[in-house]
Regions:
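A conserved beta-turn-beta hairpin within the catalytic core of GNAT-like acetyltransferases
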Residues: 59-67, 77, 100-101, 127
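Conserved beta-hairpin
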Residues: 40-55
Length: 141
């Protein structure tokens, strides 16, 4: 199966569909469009004429990056698409860096997916260089 990885072409309809396929619900379109517009970069993977995977990259474009909404459709998992997408994103970041310098890529793994990221070189927190990652949901009722 062939697939194509694209930078900054992710559309709201595909984002909403893939987001829901991960079991996270369907975000409102206006919120989705704003999130995509304000992302540092977006990535999509197309196979057989449809988008089957996506990710957003947030950050300052120089030193700090955060991987968000990394999704491969459940029926497309296990085919190397996620590995290829993550490798592509890492190379995208590498191209933003100054020679001899490293950027810091962080993420929050979906429960049960930690092993995938660890195989790709990510360290679980806490570890010898940092404490546990922390997060907080801010909700508008």
């Amino acid at each position: 199966m062939g697939y194509t990885i694209s930078d900054n072409r992710l559309q709201a309809d595909d984002y909403i569909r893939l987001f829901a396929s991960a079991g996270w619900g369907e975000p409102p379109r206006d919120m989705t469009e704003k999130a995509l517009e304000n992302s540092y970069a977006t990535f999509s993977v197309e196979a057989d004429g449809r988008v089957v995977a996506m990710a957003r990259l947030l950050g300052d474009g120089a030193m700090a990056f955060f991987l968000k909404d990394f999704v491969v459709e459940p029926q497309m998992q296990g085919r190397g698409i996620g590995k290829a997408l993550l490798a592509h994103i890492e190379e995208y970041i590498r191209l933003q860096l100054v020679n001899g310098w490293a950027g810091y890529l962080q993420l929050v793994s979906a429960k049960g997916k930690e092993g995938f990221y660890q195989k790709m070189g990510f360290a679980a927190h806490p570890h010898e260089h940092s404490g546990p990652g922390m997060s907080k949901w801010i909700r508008k009722e």
